[in-house]
């Protein structure tokens, strides 16, 4: 996994037998077609999996399991890609640390749950009409949030709390 210059998640699947080669050499791809990356004459790029980010995906219950790793993006000579958002963040964090700053972050994920089967071209319908902090036990929103929290915690991501937000179908 990696993101383009606009933050869109990108991915490539690799067979387990090819993983050692990906660690050693990277996975080649055409950077000129990734939004915010290279010009056509700088197209050759490599995605190098970072083993420290290895994580089994709990929602993919099949056997064998599925895992993900984030990748560092490099040029063929091994130099980091200046367009790699991960590298940009690492450089910024290093500069901040050199100045005595520490970086803290905490995501707040909000989303809407919509009914299935909406007719294309029509306005999507929220799954409920609940409001801020409304308690709807055994409702679809409540059950979805519980399942999502379970998967996040299975990946080692702690969740402080969840609740219904102010708009119909809106959750945090």
Name each model feature, range by range.
Residues 1-172:
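Glycine-rich, acidic/polar active-site loops that bind/position phosphate-bearing ligands
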């Amino acid at each position: 996994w990696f993101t383009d210059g606009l933050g869109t998640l990108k991915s490539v699947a690799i067979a387990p037998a090819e993983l050692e080669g990906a660690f050693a050499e990277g996975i080649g791809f055409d950077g000129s077609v990734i939004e915010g990356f290279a010009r056509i004459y700088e197209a050759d790029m490599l995605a190098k999996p970072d083993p420290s980010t290895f994580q089994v995906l709990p929602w993919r219950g099949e056997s064998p399991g599925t895992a993900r790793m984030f990748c560092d993006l490099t040029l063929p000579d091994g130099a980091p890609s200046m367009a790699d958002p991960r590298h940009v963040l690492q450089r910024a964090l290093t500069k901040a640390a050199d100045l005595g700053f520490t970086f803290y972050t905490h995501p707040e994920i909000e989303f809407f749950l919509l009914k299935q089967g909406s007719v294309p071209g029509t306005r999507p319908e929220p799954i409920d009409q609940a409001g801020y902090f409304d308690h709807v036990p055994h409702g679809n929103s409540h059950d979805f949030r519980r399942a999502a929290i379970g998967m996040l915690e299975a990946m080692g991501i702690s969740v402080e709390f969840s609740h219904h937000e102010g708009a119909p179908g809106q959750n945090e």
